[in-house]
Amino acid sequence: MASSRDRAYVTVYSPTLLTWVYDYYVLGFNLRYIWGCPTDAVLLPFFAENFSRRHLDVGVATGYLPARVLASPWRRAAAHRQHLTLLDINANSLRASDARVRAAAPGIETTCVEADVVADLPPVLASVVEEERARVEKAGGEAGSSSRSCLYDSISMFNLFHCVPGGPAKLRAISTYKALLADHGVLSGCTVLGERHATGWFSRWYLRLYNRKGIFNNINDTREEFEEVLNKEFEEVDTWMFGMVLLFRASKPRREGSGYVDLLA
């Protein structure tokens, strides 16, 4: 059973924090001044660049990023053709995010999934893989390769892994959720790295504090660990560092010997 400390990253996202604190303190102050990666100048454009009409957002917080992207005039006008799946371990986050994206883009189709990212795919998403398997068998083609694929064209994991406990083992989520990505699809995300990547004494102190409180679980996370897993699971991988934040984008998912093949078996 998870300890109360390990559960802190789940319970910290109360309705009050999500409504009054998260956007300004976490996305505004912390990312810019503590971690060195401003949301408006770096994360929002990066999210928008890798956002598609069939998108899965894993670890949604307040829904700030998809809502901002969907609020653009041309996205808003095409909201009726947009499908967005929101996944989070916290029900408060899901409710807040769903309401926010629906307000930003009336007519959008959303699906909310409450699940732990380090567990197996929840049934509603495992069924997507099964649907794709059935489509492939009927069409006699390759999974994920058709424009009619049931899989997602893009998956995002922003500000997720630095919260999740489990050490390097938590990165199995990349393999698990890669199974939902079409061959032409893109996985993108960002994470605050561990103590080795601290940019100064204050960011190191702040990082240790967050880890002691259980808000973060990333004290030993490294760029090399993420790159190793991403390169194992994808043919094309790009990573960038902004302060202590690693941005990653991966495409051309490898199928052999992966969780994807296991799920289709």
UniProtKB/Swiss-Prot annotation:
It catalyses: desmethylnectriapyrone + S-adenosyl-L-methionine = nectriapyrone + S-adenosyl-L-homocysteine + H(+). It comes from the Eukaryota. The keyword Zinc does not apply. Disruption phenotype: Completely abolishes the production of nectriapyrones but accumulates a demethylated analog of nectriapyrone. Gene3D superfamilies: Vaccinia Virus protein VP39. GO terms for molecular function: methyltransferase activity. SUPFAM superfamilies: S-adenosyl-L-methionine-dependent methyltransferases. Disulfide bonds: none annotated. Its EC number is 2.1.1.-. GO terms for biological process: methylation. InterPro entries: SAM-dependent_MTases_sf. Keywords: Methyltransferase, Transferase. Belongs to the methyltransferase superfamily. O-methyltransferase; part of the gene cluster that mediates the biosynthesis of nectriapyrone and its analogs phomopyrone A, acropyrone and zaepyrone. The nectriapyrone biosynthetic gene cluster consists of two genes, the highly reducing polyketide synthase NEC1 that produces a demethylated analog of nectriapyrone from one unit of acetyl-CoA and one unit of malonyl-CoA; and the O-methyltransferase NEC2 that further methylates the NEC1 product to yield nectriapyrone. This is O-methyltransferase NEC2.
